[in-house]
């Protein structure tokens, strides 16, 4: 079974890679929905734009969605935002994902002026999506201003992620979510002897319990990127008469452009652009765009380099770095869209980087440039002149062309012309006139009604050859060669002379042919599909062109003379067609409405090949053979068309067709050899395509073989000969058992459900008994075995609902429709199986294995539209065939579902042949030829030139070993010795962690080994490798008709969550072990300093490993760790995936009827719970069973006399044969891929769903106590806008964390009194203002299976009027109970006990079999003992599930929880688990600001003193109210030396735990007029102090000095402040209060109010009224003058009002 499991896992892995490859490369124009969440955590060191500091806020742009903004923080350079923003409804195709980005701008808010930009940074969406878990977690971004070069303007800490519809948000446990302020000292555990003086001082400071926060350590390596642009050639003139071109290059947030070269189509730029690049890179794209400058209008966009960005091209910085950092001078060709063909608004989209990425349809010239990436710590942004350069070597090529025929469903006019453009040079074909068939009117009405209108243009033999040969010098390297662009023009020439000019031409369609295409190598005509110039989808087809295009070097062309190709020669061919069956036909139709008829058209003949047979999966088993006259060279022949129609009564609906190239069907046989067996047909899947969509697929094969016979119109040999593909001896007889539990989670309920079980059969004569054949004659036309069952319980309810009512003497039976319940969860609990007499035919050859079709529908004829269906491949369950063959056939079938895009490929047969396993009858010559074809194809398409590969090898050898890949992702499990080097290189393409974004691609050359000779590999390894490699190559080429760099298969940058979790666990264990050793060394006071140094160094090495761990490990003096203890295992991957391995049943997905390109319908969340087993039976037993049935039917009176012994004998013989079969399967390799043994089951007493006893378990009521433990939610989607008034008036938008108020609803059942609880609404506990709510609550519900099988938990958002659903998750309780091996074994034991007790009761009074009864009793006691011995301390793991919204496609968040679904008897034994939310602990901070020292004077020229005051703020997360607390000291006036005395106490409330326990101290210069000027600030973290608080009641910090810093004056001394601090708990603070400042109660210590700097003279010091500048006499004179002035004023008052004193 290990071999089987490994084979199945291998094939699933391969198919998963294939699906990803198709999704990435085949549907570039298909938009997918994404959701982005950005969390702005904090900013540090922001440059101050005003005197009092900046008032920063962050503005976030994501693609073309409206920007969002954070709240504004006042007067600070280090601020905490801690806000999350959700960007929904982001629809992007693959190219838009590569082009668009997240832009973060930090802006200074001004009330009455323009808001200046502080700095910005960008993150590429594609870079983010390729990172680990699609996220950057707590990443520091350096802010850059466009006008300030690369000088940092501050630092921004962010977390962000992007998810698609199939992705889940990243999850981090509570310990990882802790903020870590201690990242400023990386040498904390390094011995002092190894540090310099400055490092030792910093280390001493950082060992204190209260430390300042420094700027983030810049761990990014700086590189210099040189983009050297030499020149351009053949640039187009888009408007006017000149081309004034320039080139703009963008790297990250920096943009540079060359000078504008006017009036030249061959501009010479000679410019070198210098970009500083930092690793890891957060935006890895290098974008180069070529423009045509216009003076009085907007510039014309010409083209971009690269045209289609890819993660593996040269213009990805990570890829460039992995290839050695150097790309030599190369030509890059430009492909654009002519102005008349451009869609409206295309230029605006290009400028805004929002282009839809329209494929270039016209050649626009080429650019010579090079890239160089090297380490340089002094790189500066700018332009330099370019020195010498070396152009790539060139070679002269010649292109020849012949045109023969054009077929199009579009009217291209009376005349057409074909133009071939290669590297800017053009040749044109002769004009061709539209053809009018003379025999068109002679076609019968039946055929003409089915024939679609086709416009045909045929060149005469004398006009087909284009006499002009195009000669051109192009680079020798094939990756630098331009595409051959073939354009179709409709021409309106002069009617007399047939002359025309450019104005008479209108381009209709085009095709781009890669120069590496094998179609250009040989001189033979081929059919090409042309695309319309204005296409809607990239797969749209305009017309088919038969032409011959040759591209050869001049030397080869001279050696090979050009011969005219004539088409008039005819040849007789023997056509053989093999149509086995259809699969998943008409996804939008029901099976009853599907009756397919097929019509073959080859040459001029139209033949009906398949008559109508009902069913979506049908077996035709038809082969036909006839003679046909075709072109001698099949390249000229038109495609073989098979049209399909759906018969609806007398009407026939066209549903699509398949097209096969005639030349691909040719079979060549050496007629000289005698007795050669006919070649075996090569079967493959063909999709029935209609308007680009698949309407199903068929399994067929077609052959064309030359014949020496002559065509005689009256000869019978010309008539088709029909036969069967497989005869009776090619089948095996099987019995299919299908234990059906039921259907779960239907989107729309069904009132009268019935279940249909259907398997297609080649015929039914042997299947149905005589009686059934008479009753159901219609089955002989359907050709499938079918069983229909109904729901018995619903029938009984319906009968009870019938009411009889008498009206006018007549009795009518009326069903109360309103009492019928629409069921969404239906239990059938029955075993569907065919009788042994009705054994089904299954082909021995597994490639013809039929599909089991299941359908659930409503019996009522009026509502038959409510239907769901599913298809199951029987290969997994077939008991014959080895594992390798089955895996190959599974891959063959799965690829058949996905190969619709291969129909667009020019060489699909070469690809499909690799999917088919070589038959045993194939000779070695055919095998060797296939291997040689594969090698040639690989040589032509997958490698560069010899010289280029040698350069890459040399560069890779010199690259740093530290940047090699750490792990490989196996694309295919092949033998290492036989594995091609190119595939080994592909396996090395994997992602590193998000902290090391320098992703490496170990691309080693295989040209050296190929130069020494090809190595002959085994057949098995070659075919497996060829399938994988050619599939990637062909899928890439089929959808990419253009490229600017070599082919590199797209590889997703992902790392499995299991690997990541194991890596973290291993690191944590190592760190803990080493830390414990250090602690023991300190505790025992050992003097082995060397050992201690070594251990400390190892700890630092582990912490500074490539992957930066974000879990917070608080290191105290003892080195211990402090983390949240979950008390159980944490499972990050979906637990359901693990549980399904132990389920005793399978779950088959249900689909609704509807169109879907790669599936059988519209997928739903509904499933069928059932299992499947295929039993092979001997023909003798079948005949014996049939004979007994016939005898019984002949004598109906003796039907009941058919003794039980007779039936038991038949069954016993059957069981014996099945046992023999099963035994042989165990001994040999022939056994099903599916395992029927559940993991962890007791093999003596297994849970066997194929026994009715266990199947009835799902019908009985099974009581559960379900305990739901909700811990917390992370990254939930914001629900509404909440924004500050300033930003709202400015027109901004924001959806932030303050807009979500989550609460919980558990269960959706109805409560039955107080004892049975099935629904809990916890709206009393609402989490306020958060996207990461913490619940830490347990909810206990009652559940009864199967009624309450689905548990629903909803996260609601509390609204002002109506509560809205944020998201929900559902849990299948049946899966949880039966997926846990302990619970499943317990249920199995109890079931066996009940069965044995029934047997004991049955044999209670039968004393003859007392031994059997005693044996049952012994087993009962044994099982009871086993139940008691089971583990009763079950600790189910913590898991993460996605929150889904019924109306939204993307995930709405993640919930952290664990579940205990225990039976009642188990719930009584196991008590509920205890979960406690970290309770807030309230403290009080008593901070005393004593003095300041050396505070600088803000403007020494104008002022000689400074008026000092301090502002202290406590972060909002440290306050229980969630508000920032800001307090100020009084002002120390007139300080000349920067010293100030305050003796000022501040009291702050503190609550822990908190995210940011920080105090920000800012010193300012007081100003009576205007704003105060900020002189410096420092932020101190209390995180270490909080740990001390948990150990004791009081934390006290003695008087300590902290230095001030200012981001505008880096490295300058801004003074310091002397403070002391005491933190006590709230109870102690309330019992012993203190006052603010020097207020009462003034104690502990008593603070004296300072007098220095508080007088009026101090206030006026330094101004024009400064008394200190006067002498003593001047001051005395002033006093006298003041006295005289007061006396005069008093006398004047008495003079004006003399009675004032009397009054």
Curated annotation (Swiss-Prot):
Q: How does it sit in the membrane?
A: Single-pass membrane protein
> Among its keywords, does the record have Membrane?
yes
List, alphabetically, the InterPro entries matched.
C2_dom, C2_domain_sf, FerIin_dom, Ferlin
**Principal localisation:** membrane
Q: Which Gene Ontology terms of cellular component type are present?
A: membrane
Acidic residues composition-biased segments: 916-928
- Bias class Basic and acidic residues marks the residues at 993-1009, 1641-1651
Where do transmembrane segments lie in this chain? 1681-1701
Q: Which family does it belong to?
A: Belongs to the ferlin family.
UniProt-recorded name of the protein: Ferlin 2
Species source reads Tetrahymena thermophila (strain SB210)
């Amino acid at each position: 079974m290990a071999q089987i499991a490994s084979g199945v896992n291998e094939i699933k892995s391969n198919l998963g890679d294939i699906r990803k490859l198709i999704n990435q490369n085949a549907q570039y124009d298909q938009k997918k929905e994404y959701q982005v969440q950005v969390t702005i955590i904090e900013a540090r060191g922001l440059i101050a734009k005003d005197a009092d500091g900046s008032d920063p806020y962050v503005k976030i742009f994501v693609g073309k969605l409206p920007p969002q903004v954070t709240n504004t923080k006042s007067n600070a350079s280090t601020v905490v935002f801690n806000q999350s923003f959700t960007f929904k409804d982001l629809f992007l195709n693959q190219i838009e994902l590569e082009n668009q980005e997240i832009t973060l701008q930090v802006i200074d808010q001004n009330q009455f002026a323009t808001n200046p930009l502080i700095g910005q940074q960008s993150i590429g969406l594609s870079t983010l999506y390729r990172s680990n878990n699609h996220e950057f977690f707590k990443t520091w971004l350096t802010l850059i201003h466009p006008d300030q070069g690369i000088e940092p303007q501050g630092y921004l800490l962010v977390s962000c992620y992007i998810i698609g519809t199939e992705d889940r948000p990243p999850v981090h446990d509570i310990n990882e979510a802790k903020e870590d302020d201690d990242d400023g000292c990386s040498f904390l555990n390094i011995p002092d002897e190894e540090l310099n003086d400055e490092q030792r001082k910093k280390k001493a400071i950082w060992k204190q319990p209260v430390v300042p926060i420094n700027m983030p350590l810049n761990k990014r390596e700086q590189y210099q990127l040189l983009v050297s642009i030499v020149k351009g050639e053949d640039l187009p003139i888009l408007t006017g008469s000149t081309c004034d071109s320039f080139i703009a290059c963008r790297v990250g947030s920096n943009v540079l452009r060359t000078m504008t070269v006017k009036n030249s189509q061959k501009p010479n730029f000679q410019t070198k652009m210098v970009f500083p690049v930092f690793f890891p890179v957060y935006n890895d794209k290098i974008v180069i765009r070529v423009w045509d400058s216009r003076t009085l209008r907007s510039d014309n966009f010409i083209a971009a380099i690269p045209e289609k960005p890819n993660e593996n091209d040269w213009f990805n910085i990570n890829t460039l770095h992995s290839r050695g950092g150097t790309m030599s001078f190369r030509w890059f060709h430009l492909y654009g869209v002519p102005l008349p063909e451009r869609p409206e608004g295309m230029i605006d989209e290009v400028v805004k980087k929002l282009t839809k990425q329209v494929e270039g349809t016209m050649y626009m010239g080429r650019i010579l440039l090079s890239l160089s990436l090297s380490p340089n710590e002094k790189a500066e942004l700018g332009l330099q002149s370019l020195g010498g350069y070396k152009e790539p070597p060139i070679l002269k090529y010649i292109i020849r062309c012949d045109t023969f025929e054009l077929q199009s469903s579009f009217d291209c006019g009376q005349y057409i012309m074909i133009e071939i453009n290669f590297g800017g040079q053009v040749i044109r074909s002769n004009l061709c006139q539209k053809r009018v068939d003379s025999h068109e009117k002679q076609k019968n009405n039946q055929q003409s009604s089915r024939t679609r209108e086709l416009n045909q243009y045929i060149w005469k033999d004398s006009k087909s050859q284009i006499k002009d040969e195009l000669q051109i010098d192009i680079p020798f390297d094939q990756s630098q060669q331009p595409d051959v662009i073939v354009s179709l023009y409709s021409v309106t020439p002069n009617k007399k002379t047939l002359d025309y000019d450019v104005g008479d031409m209108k381009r209709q369609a085009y095709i781009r042919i890669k120069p590496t295409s094998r179609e250009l190598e040989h001189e033979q005509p081929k059919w090409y599909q042309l695309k319309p110039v204005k296409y809607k989808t990239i797969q749209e087809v305009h017309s088919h062109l038969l032409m011959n295009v040759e591209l050869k070097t001049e030397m080869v062309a001279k050696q090979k003379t050009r011969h005219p190709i004539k088409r008039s020669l005819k040849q007789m061919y023997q056509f053989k067609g093999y149509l086995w069956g259809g699969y998943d036909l008409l996804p939008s139709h029901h099976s009853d409405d599907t009756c397919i008829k097929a019509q073959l058209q080859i040459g001029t003949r139209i033949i009906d090949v398949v008559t109508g047979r009902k069913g979506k999966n049908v077996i035709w088993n038809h082969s036909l053979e006839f003679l046909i006259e075709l072109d001698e060279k099949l390249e000229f022949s038109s495609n073989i068309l098979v049209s399909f129609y759906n018969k609806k009564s007398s009407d026939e609906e066209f549903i699509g067709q398949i097209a096969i190239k005639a030349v691909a069907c040719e079979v060549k046989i050496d007629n000289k050899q005698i007795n050669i067996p006919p070649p075996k047909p090569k079967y493959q899947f063909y999709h029935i395509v209609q308007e680009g969509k698949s309407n199903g697929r068929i399994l067929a094969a077609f052959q064309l073989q030359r014949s020496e016979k002559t065509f005689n119109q009256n000869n019978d040999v010309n008539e088709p000969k029909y036969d069967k593909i497989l005869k009776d001896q090619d089948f095996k007889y099987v019995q299919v058992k299908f234990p059906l539990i039921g259907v779960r989670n239907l989107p729309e309920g069904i009132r009268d459900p019935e279940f249909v079980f259907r398997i297609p059969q080649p015929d039914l004569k042997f299947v149905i008994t005589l009686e059934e054949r008479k009753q159901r004659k219609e089955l002989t036309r359907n050709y499938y075995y079918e069983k229909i069952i109904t729901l018995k319980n619903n029938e009984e309810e319906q009968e009870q609902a019938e009411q009889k009512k008498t009206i006018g003497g007549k009795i009518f039976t009326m069903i109360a429709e309103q009492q019928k319940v629409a069921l969404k969860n239906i239990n059938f609990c029955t075993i569907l199986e065919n009788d042994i007499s009705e054994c089904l035919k299954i082909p021995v050859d597994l490639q013809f294995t039929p599909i089991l079709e299941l359908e659930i529908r409503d019996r009522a004829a009026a509502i038959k539209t409510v239907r769901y269906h599913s298809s199951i491949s029987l290969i997994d369950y077939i008991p014959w065939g080895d594992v390798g063959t089955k895996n190959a056939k599974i891959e063959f079938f799965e690829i058949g579902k996905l190969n619709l895009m291969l129909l667009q490929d020019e060489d699909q047969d070469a690809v499909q042949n690799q999917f088919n396993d070589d038959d045993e009858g194939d000779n070695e010559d055919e095998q060797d030829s296939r291997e040689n074809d594969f090698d040639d194809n690989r040589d032509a398409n997958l490698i560069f030139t010899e010289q280029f590969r040698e350069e890459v090898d040399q560069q890779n050898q010199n690259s740093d070993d530290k940047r090699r890949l750490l792990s490989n992702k196996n694309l295919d499990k092949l033998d290492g010795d036989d594995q091609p080097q190119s595939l080994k290189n592909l396996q090395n393409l994997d992602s590193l962690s998000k902290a090391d974004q320098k992703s490496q691609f170990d691309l080693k050359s295989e040209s050296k080994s190929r130069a020494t000779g090809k190595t002959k590999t085994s057949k098995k390894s070659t075919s497996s490798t060829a399938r994988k490699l050619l599939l990637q190559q062909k899928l890439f080429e089929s959808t990419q008709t253009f490229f600017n760099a070599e082919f590199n298969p797209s590889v997703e940058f992902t790392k499995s969550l299991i690997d990541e979790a194991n890596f973290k666990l291993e690191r944590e264990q190592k760190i803990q072990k080493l830390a414990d050793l250090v602690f023991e060394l300190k505790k025992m006071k050992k003097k082995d300093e060397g050992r201690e140094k070594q251990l400390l160094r190892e700890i630092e090495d582990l912490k500074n490993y490539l992957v930066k761990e974000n879990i917070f490990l608080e290191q105290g003096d003892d080195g211990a760790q402090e983390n949240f203890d979950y008390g159980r295992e944490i499972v990050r991957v979906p637990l359901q995936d693990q549980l399904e391995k132990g389920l005793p049943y399978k779950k088959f997905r249900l689909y609704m009827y509807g169109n879907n390109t790669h599936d059988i319908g519209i997928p739903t969340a509904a499933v069928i719970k059932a299992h499947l087993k295929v039993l092979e039976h001997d023909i003798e037993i079948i005949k014996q069973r049939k004979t007994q049935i016939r005898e019984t039917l002949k004598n109906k009176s003796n039907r009941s006399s058919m003794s039980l012994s007779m039936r038991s004998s038949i069954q016993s013989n059957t069981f014996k044969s099945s046992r023999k079969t099963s035994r042989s399967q165990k001994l040999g390799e022939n056994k099903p891929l599916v395992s029927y043994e559940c993991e962890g089951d007791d093999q003596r007493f297994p849970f066997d769903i194929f026994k009715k006893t266990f199947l009835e378990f799902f019908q009985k009521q099974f009581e559960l106590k379900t305990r739901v433990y909700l811990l917390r939610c992370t990254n939930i989607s914001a629900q509404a806008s909440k924004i500050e008034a300033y930003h709202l008036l400015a027109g901004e938008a924001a959806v932030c964390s303050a807009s979500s108020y989550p609460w919980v609803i558990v269960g959706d059942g109805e409560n039955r009194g107080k004892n049975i609880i099935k629904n809990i609404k916890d709206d009393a506990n609402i989490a306020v203002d958060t996207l990461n709510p913490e619940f830490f609550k347990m909810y206990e519900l009652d559940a009864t299976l199967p009624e309450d099988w689905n548990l629903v938990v909803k996260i609601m958002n509390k609204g002002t009027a109506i509560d809205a659903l944020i998201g929900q998750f559902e849990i299948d309780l049946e899966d949880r109970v039966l997926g846990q091996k302990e619970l499943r074994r317990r249920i199995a034991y109890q079931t066996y006990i009940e069965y044995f007790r029934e047997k004991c009761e049955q044999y209670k009074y039968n004393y003859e079999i007392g031994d059997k009864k005693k044996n049952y009793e012994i087993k009962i006691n044994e099982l009871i003992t086993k139940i008691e011995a089971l583990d009763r301390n079950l600790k189910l793991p913590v898991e993460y599930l996605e929150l889904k919204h019924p109306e939204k496609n993307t995930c709405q968040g993640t919930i952290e929880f664990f579940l205990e679904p225990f039976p009642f008897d188990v719930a009584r034994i196991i008590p509920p688990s205890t979960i406690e939310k970290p309770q807030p602990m309230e403290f009080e901070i008593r901070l005393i600001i004593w003095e300041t020292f050396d505070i600088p004077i803000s403007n020494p020229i104008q002022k000689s003193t400074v008026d000092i005051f301090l502002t202290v703020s406590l972060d909002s997360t440290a306050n229980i109210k969630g508000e920032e607390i800001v307090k100020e000291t009084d002002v120390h006036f007139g300080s000349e030396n920067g010293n100030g005395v305050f003796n000022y106490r501040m009291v702050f409330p503190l609550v822990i735990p908190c995210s940011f326990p920080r105090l920000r101290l800012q010193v300012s210069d007081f100003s009576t007029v205007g704003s105060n000027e900020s002189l410096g600030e420092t932020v101190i973290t209390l995180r270490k102090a909080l740990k001390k608080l948990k150990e004791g009641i009081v934390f006290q910090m003695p008087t300590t000095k902290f230095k001030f810093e200012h981001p505008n004056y880096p490295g300058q001394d801004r003074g310091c402040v002397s403070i002391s601090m005491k933190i006590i708990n709230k109870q102690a603070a309330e019992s012993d209060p203190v006052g603010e400042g020097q207020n009462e109660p003034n104690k502990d210590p008593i603070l004296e109010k300072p007098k220095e700097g508080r007088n009026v003279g101090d206030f006026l010091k330094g101004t024009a009224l400064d008394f200190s500048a006067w002498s003593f006499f001047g001051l005395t004179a002033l006093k006298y003058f003041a006295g005289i002035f007061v006396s005069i004023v008093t006398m004047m008052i008495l003079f004006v009002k003399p009675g004032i004193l009397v009054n």
